[in-house]
Amino acid sequence: MGSVNSRGHKAEAQVVMMGLDSAGKTTILYKLKGNQLVDTLPTVGFNVEPLEAPGHVSLTLWDIGGQTQLRATWKDYLEGIDLLVYVLDSTDEARLPEAVAELKEVLEDPNMAGVPFLVLANKQEAPGALPLLEIRNRLGLEGFQKHCWELRACSALTGQGLQEALQSLLHLLKSR
C-alpha cells in the first residue's frame, strides 16, 4: 500500500491497530489525532482516521474493534498493511494470555509476512500495571524473528509515551 522514503517526499502508510476490547485503541487513535481525550464506546467494526506524522508521512490509522465476536474479521484488515500496532491493557493480567494468543494468530497470517509491528503497553499510569520487562517476557517477543518489532509503554489517558510510540512507528515503517 504505502511507502516511506528518505528523500523528503511525502510518503503514505496504512497502519492497523488491534488488541482486545477495552485495551485503549480508540482513545490512543484520537489522542494521537488531536491530543484530545474523548469518551468512547466499544468499537463495532472500525474507526479510520488520517494522521500527518513528522517527516512528511501521511498515515491512515485503522482502529479495529476487539470484542471476541469481531476478532474473526481481523484477518480481513491485514492485506496490504504497512504496520501493525497491537495495544494491550497493562493492568489486565488475567487476559494477557488471551492477548498473546490473538497477537500470535495475527502475526501468523500470510498477509503479515515481513510486516513490522509495535506493541503498546497501555494504561501504564494505573496502579498495578505490569512493568514493560514483564510484558516483554510474557509476550515472548523474541520469538517473532520474522518481524521487526518494538514495545513501548504508554498511557492513552495522560498521553505519556504516545509521541515516543509515534516515533517508534515511523522508525519501524522505515525499516521495511
Swiss-Prot record:
GO terms for molecular function: GTP binding; GTPase activity. Pfam families: Arf (PF00025). A lipid is attached at residue 2 (N-myristoyl glycine). Signal peptide: none annotated. Keywords: GTP-binding, Lipoprotein, Myristate, Nucleotide-binding. It comes from the Eukaryota. InterPro entries: P-loop_NTPase (IPR027417), Small_GTP-bd (IPR005225), Small_GTPase_ARF (IPR024156), Small_GTPase_ARF/SAR (IPR006689). One of its GO terms (biological process) is hematopoietic progenitor cell differentiation. SMART domains: ARF, SAR. GTP binds at residues 19-26, 63-67, 122-125. May play a role in apoptosis. May act as a tumor suppressor. Belongs to the small GTPase superfamily. Arf family. This is ADP-ribosylation factor-like protein 11. It comes from Mus musculus (Mouse). The lineage of its organism: Eukaryota, Metazoa, Chordata, Craniata, Vertebrata.
